Regions:
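Glycine-rich phosphate/ribose-binding loops and adjacent secondary-structure elements
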Residues: 105-177
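N-terminal capping/small domains of soluble enzymes
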Residues: 1-105, 116
Length: 177
């Protein structure tokens, strides 16, 4: 879960936990919280349609990059971070206005077919100097989705199940999960 869905303190505590048990921490869709990154053992950067924290320096410093195509709790939907959760630090990381709703698109405009996804995987691999590139999908039409993802030749695929959580789902979805 992203910084915004979870507090700064929670994100840092989870990162410290990953260091203690030597596992990976994912940024979530909200960009890179520097203190979380510094305290994690391995750090997976979630590459999302809004392109939060995307620059060559960040792509080179993370352990891996995960392209978010889908998320279990909100398959086919974008995100919504309510204005009251958009602090000064969150606004800065996301490049958004303080105390305004942050709406995340449901998909990448530049990915319309398998070749577009393959091109993005290749581009991110090059820009990150060879970091592993993954693709995150929601568990929906699994065989079709896996075929699409595999065609891009990622290093890993994350299948996100419905039972997961997010602070950015529409209220009707959160209430039903």
């Amino acid at each position: 879960m992203s910084f915004g869905a979870l507090s700064k303190e929670a994100k840092i505590a989870l990162a410290i936990g990953t260091s203690k048990v030597k596992t990976a921490m994912c940024s979530g869709e909200g960009g890179i919280l520097e203190e979380e990154f510094e305290n994690s053992y391995q750090y997976i950067f979630e590459y999302v349609p809004n392109k939060y924290s995307v620059n060559d320096e960040n792509l080179k410093k993370v352990s891996a990059i995960e392209i978010k195509i889908g998320q279990g709790t909100k398959p086919g939907m974008g995100g919504h971070l309510p204005a009251e959760k958009v602090t000064e630090e969150i606004a800065k990381i996301r490049g958004k206005n303080l105390h305004e709703d942050v709406i995340s698109p449901s998909k990448f405009k530049e990915i319309t077919d398998k070749e577009d996804l393959k091109k993005l995987v290749s581009e991110l691999r090059e820009r990150s100097e060879g970091r592993p590139i993954g693709i995150k999908i929601a568990a929906g039409h699994i065989e079709k989705d896996l075929e699409f993802a595999c065609s891009a030749k990622p290093d890993f695929i994350t299948i996100d199940g419905r039972g997961g959580a997010t602070g950015a789902s529409p209220k009707i979805i959160k209430d039903a999960t």
